[in-house]
C-alpha cells in the first residue's frame, strides 16, 4: 500500500510525467535488450509504431503497375522511394484496402476445401446455442484436451508424408504411405486440390490441422470434447460460465466416444468368457467403428480410459503409467512403498488377505466429477484434500481414498459378509470387496473415521460424517478445497504386461488396471459399431443372436458341411454356437441336443437322406451337452420376443423360413442371407462340372485323409488321390488326371461313376 501511495505522489508532480514520457532512452542495457538478436522483443508496440508511419509495408515492384498511385479520395497508395536494402517499394496500408476492393479476383473454389476447418467451425458456431451466463465459483482443473475439432488421427510422421505427397509431390525424399487412412486421405486431397493457387505452405499448414490431433493442457470445468474446447474462452471464466450447445458433432469426438463404448462392451464380454484375453483380442480384431478397424483406431487414438487402455495393453501398445482404482486415476507424485501380504479382520470377523503398501506416498486422484490430493503412510491416511462438483462426487472420492488407505478403522467398519462377485461370478479381490461394500453404504465408515478440530485455512473447509461442510470440525485428515487438482500432464507411455484375466501390470508388477475398474455406464455410440465376433451377438438381444447364428452357418456352409460329415464333435463345440444356447430353455437343452445329434447320425448312415435345410436349421441345437433319451420332437422352442417361439423340425415356421427356389433364408421375417450352394436340386450338374480333370475311383478311402470340399480339389497334384465330399453329403475317392486331353469325357462318366460309387 505504501509503495502505491508513494508512486501516486510521484506521478502527481508534472516533472515526473515529463521525464517518463519525453526523455530519450539512452541506457546501454535497455538499448541492448531491444536491439540484439533477430527476435522482436515487443511485437505489439513495434506493430503500432510501424502502422503509425505512412508507408509501413514493402511490396514487389510489380505493385506499381497493378495499383494506381492514388485512390478515389486522392490519398497516395505507394511511395516512389524504394525500401532501403532491397529493391522493393514502400506501400501504404490504404493500398491493401484498394487491392481488397478492386484487385483481380481468382477462383474461390479451393477456399472452402483448404480452409475446411475454419468453414466448419463457422457452421458449428452458427448453429450452436448460447444459453444464460451464471456467476459462480469455477472449479477448473487442467486436463489434456483436444483443441482441434474435425481432425483425422494420423501420427505427426504419417501426416508429414501425406502432406508432402499432396502439396509437394515432386520433391525428393522417401515417402511411405502404408496405412489405409493415409492412402484414402492422399487420394481425396489430391483430387480436391487440383489446380489450387493458394500458397503451398498455407495448404500444408491447413492440412496439418485436418490430419493431426493437437492437444493442450488447459484448465477446464465442463465438457472436454474438442467442440467445447474451441469455445472455452466463451463458456467459462474465473467466476462465470455460459451454457453452450455445439452446433454440430465432429468425427474425432465421435470416434473417441464410440471407442470407449466399444472397448467397455468388449472388456465386459471378454471377462466372462473361458479365456478372457484371447476373446478380447478376437473381438478387438473383428470390430469396426464407423467403418474403421478398431485395432487401427486403438493404435492411433490417445484416449485414456480404463477399458480402452486394457484393449491397448492386450495389443502390446504402451499406455499411461497411472493406475486406476474405484474409477479414479491415481498418479504417484512422490514417495515410494513396498508391498507385503497381510491378513486383517473385518468388523464381521471375516479374514481378508490384503497387499499392504508400506511407506509414505503422495498421489493425485482424478475422477470425472471430483479430484483430490492424497498423502498416506503405511495403512494410514495422513491427509486428503478433495474438490468436486457436488456433495455426492466429493463423497465418492472420500470413500475411494479411505479404502485405498487400508486403515484399520475402515476394515473394522465392515458390517456383514463381503461376497461380491464379478460378471463371471468370481469373487472380487479384497480391495474391490471393501470398495463395493462402502460404495453401497458408507455411513458406518464415516461415523467411525474420527473427527478433529481444524484451523481456518483460506479456500479450505472441513467436512462432517454427514457430508455437511464446517469451519470448526472435520473428519480426520480430510478437507474440501475450492481448487481442483490438475490431471497428470505428461503424455509418457510405458510398456505393460497383461495376464489372461485382463489384469494390466507395469514392469514392477503393480496392477494398473483390471476389468473391475471398467465403468458400468452404458451410452449410445455416435458411430456405428460393427462387432463381427460371435461373442458380441448378444449385445443387441435374442433376435440378433438368432439371425447371426444362422447367417454364420450359411456363410460358412462349405466348411460346415465337411465338418458335419467328417468331424461333427468339433463342429458342435464351435464358439459360434455358444450365444444360441441362452435362447434354448435350460431344462430341455440336453434332450434337444441328444435328439438332433441322433437325427444327424442317421442322415450320415443312410445314403440319400442328407437334407441341407434341416441340417442348417437344427445344427445350433446340437451344440449343448447331449442327454440320451428316447424323446422325439416335432418342434423345438427358442425364447425370443419375450416368449417361446417354435422352430419346426420338418417345414417352415415364422422363426425359420427357407425358400428352396430362391435359396433365401428368413429369420423372424428378417432376411438372413442366401445359400450359395444347395446340392439338393443340382446334384448331377455340379459334380460333373467340378470333377472334370478327376477320375472317380470308388467309395471313400480313409487312408487318403479327411474329405476335401470341391473347391479344395484344385490344390491336388496330377496323379494325387483324395476323398471328396459331393452334393448329398456323400464322400468318394478321386484321382487328379495325369493328362489334360481326356478332361472332356470326365463330365459324362463322372455322373455314372458317382452313382456307382455311392450305391
Curated annotation (Swiss-Prot):
InterPro entries the UniProt entry points to: Flu_PB2_2nd, Flu_PB2_6th, Flu_PB2_C, Flu_PB2_CAP-bd, Flu_PB2_middle, Flu_PB2_N, INV_PB2, PB2_helical
Disulfide cross-links: none
Site (Mammalian adaptation): 627
Endpoints of the signal sequence: none
GO term, biological process aspect, one: viral RNA genome replication
Subcellular location: Virion; Host nucleus; Host mitochondrion
Cellular-component GO terms for this entry: host cell mitochondrion; host cell nucleus; virion component
Key words of the record: Cap snatching, Eukaryotic host gene expression shutoff by virus, Eukaryotic host transcription shutoff by virus, Host gene expression shutoff by virus, Host mitochondrion, Host nucleus, Host-virus interaction, Inhibition of host innate immune response by virus, Inhibition of host MAVS by virus, Inhibition of host RLR pathway by virus, Inhibition of host RNA polymerase II by virus, mRNA capping, mRNA processing, Viral immunoevasion, Viral transcription, Virion
Short motif Nuclear localization signal, span: 736-739
Assembly and interaction partners: Influenza RNA polymerase is composed of three subunits: PB1, PB2 and PA. Interacts (via N-terminus) with PB1 (via C-terminus). Interacts with nucleoprotein NP (via N-terminus). Interacts (via N-terminus) with host MAVS (via N-terminus); this interaction inhibits host innate immune response.
Function: Plays an essential role in transcription initiation and cap-stealing mechanism, in which cellular capped pre-mRNAs are used to generate primers for viral transcription. Recognizes and binds the 7-methylguanosine-containing cap of the target pre-RNA which is subsequently cleaved after 10-13 nucleotides by the viral protein PA. Plays a role in the initiation of the viral genome replication and modulates the activity of the ribonucleoprotein (RNP) complex.
HAMAP family xref list: INV_PB2 (MF_04062)
Protein's name in the database: Polymerase basic protein 2
Gene transcribed to yield this protein: PB2
